[in-house]
From Swiss-Prot:
Top-level taxon of origin: Bacteria
Membrane-crossing segments per the record: none
Official protein name in the record: UPF0178 protein Rpal_2485
Similarity comment: family membership: Belongs to the UPF0178 family.
InterPro entries listed in its UniProt record: UPF0178
Amino acid sequence: MTDALTRIYVDADACPVKDEVYKVAERHHLPVTLVAGGFIRVPQHPLIERVAAGSGMDAADDWIAERIKPGDIVITADIPLASRCVKAGATAIAPNGKPFTEESIGMTLAVRNLMTDLRSTGEITGGPRAFSPRDRSTFLSALDSAIRRIARRRAAPT
């Protein structure tokens, strides 16, 4: 069991792995907070909390970033939110299982900004590839690994 101080935050509006988060969180007895711009349906469970952050631009992102702390985990595809959370000392994981780290977040943000610029000029069209079963499996592995890593860190003598 992991220290109850670890909380999993989910940027929930378009998250394709909410069910996987519920299962892993229940197995490790971790609280989950799903944050969305509006109402989302979540299972009734004492470990799961739903937050409607409001419809303002980046309202859900701001809500998460203002509360996340070292030892917490955020699930998001939003690279600027991931950057804010990593800077706060949290673990950030994309729904496809890709971890955002202090070492990778700068380059990831730069590539995101470049792609945004290229799309706005019409040089690139289309979006990311479809979410796959392999992405789901990679995500489950990444989340489980992150939880175990945080638990080891907290259990280590200081």
